[in-house]
């Protein structure tokens, strides 16, 4: 892997650190490399959870590398099969990703965090989508994912004026799961990752699949859909060894041993 990405495997947890001084900005080359990492994570049966963070204490990521843009990299450049930052367009990832936001998450950096399943941020973190002030739009998920969380008036202000949102406000709006000190950030993210590892992998995959396929459906239609047999993971959960192991472990007062089948 390149000098821009540092990978650490802790059992079934993969930690990815973006390290591109000074602002952890992402060009097309780095985006391709991040895509390879996330696709390998998706396909590795030994890995259960990924944590993505930035090096240093100031920037999670400033988003698209404007130096690369100034040198000719186009806004519609090929950023790889996972989309910008390697994650924003992987729509079949059935393992959870935690964004440990250690500082500013601007533009594509904010969009990378929004593509994760959980956001844990340091109390000095700040979020913004300033693309309109640069003559472009946040089309790597920001303008699509943020309206699913925030009211339209707040979204409009963020995407049209580029206003920043601090960590505590992001927590109040439900953008982030937790706000902790900078010193506690990675330990807190690892604690959350371990909690996810303690849950059955097939159940996690089924939950992500259900969210992904039914989020825009009326509840009654969604019920019919998930019980129609078209989903991959939900029927597997119902007839899995893990579905037997969970209640058995509870009855025997021990931790379950998940097999993922």
Swiss-Prot record:
Active site location: 111, 131
Domain of life: Bacteria
Database matches in PROSITE patterns: ENOYL_COA_HYDRATASE (PS00166)
Claim: Transport is one of the keywords in the record: no
Reaction catalysis annotation: (R)-carnitinyl-CoA = crotonobetainyl-CoA + H2O
GO MF annotation terms: hydro-lyase activity; L-carnitine CoA-transferase activity
Regions annotated as coiled coil: none
Enzyme Commission code: 4.2.1.149
CDD domains linked: crotonase-like (cd06558)
Keyword Lyase: yes
Keywords: Lyase
Pathway: Amine and polyamine metabolism; carnitine metabolism
Top-tier EC class: lyase
Single Gene Ontology BP annotation: carnitine metabolic process
Family designation: Belongs to the enoyl-CoA hydratase/isomerase family.
Protein name: Carnitinyl-CoA dehydratase
Organism of origin: Shigella flexneri
